[in-house]
Amino acid sequence: MSETVAPFLLGTRGLHRDLDAFVVATRFDRSGKAAAFALGDGSVHLVAIADTANWRKLEVHGGAALALSPDTSPRCFISGGDDGKLRRIGGNDAVSDIADFRSKWVEHVASHPGDKGKGLIAAGVGKLVYLFDQNGQKLKELPHPSAVTGLAFDTKGKRIGASHYNGATLWFVAAKTDSPRKLEWKGSHTAFAVHPDGDAVVTAMQENALHGWRLSDGQHMRMSGYPAKTQSLSFTRNGKWLASSGADAMVLWPFFGGGPMGKAPIELAGGDGIICTQVAAHPQHEMVAGGFADGLVVLADINTSRILPVAPPEHGAISALAWSPDGTQLAFGTEQGFAAIIDLSKRE
């Protein structure tokens, strides 16, 4: 990795806790005023940004937490677990059921705030995606040919997509008669991302590669060369770059000037032979955060390749990474249960 003399931000601008269980996911609520960490022991830890000394532990799932998302409303979260529960965590720390799928795992959750009270919640359970309104009333079930492995709404909330074996499927959420668009490519697809302008989707594949489809003309996009499986995908705010894990650097593919076909990606913060496990593009600027298998966390400027060290390689492999909506806070968690929030807001 590029050498730098700057101190790690964890020591100068961070607050952390040892939570004693694998950090499955971390997210900020839509207001950006609170962060949540979902753990492998079924608990969810909440932290108000205005009071980061106070970490609240909630017992949310009877088994492991498997998925976490901000809710449709500003101050709540949605979680899924291997106890079959899809649950809402309220701004007052109250936990309530949206749905109970009993013995079936809720492995993927997503939400969209919608307009004028028309927010949507989605849960991936086996081969089905369940769609709920913001009040938790079930709207429809969307079937897939195999287990859902990734789930995301597009930017406008008009479509939802899921990855699965042999491809991905896109659905219009408001369609009275569901006629999904099926995107086919043989193999095991394990993660899913939608381009910010809605014209492309990308999946990670079991065979250490990415596959994409340009929706306007069906053009396939193949992105390969990874030494490990890609677990994390993140488009930059304007969709110019797709950041990905799975190599000993953050790998960014160009999605401008016709897309990534025939073009080499750029690699940031690489060279040490340690696999990048998580990426998170900044929501406002051309920057990307990356977490590595040795616990290192860095922030990279895409245009200059300048690297800012966030956390040293001391606390276990990075398993979760997320920005607040305004990009002033960065949260991360590790397989060893270490969790932290970095304050990047301007200081007087």
Sequence positions of predicted segments:
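WD40-repeat beta-propeller superdomains and closely related acidic/aromatic-rich repeat-like regions
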Residues: 1-348
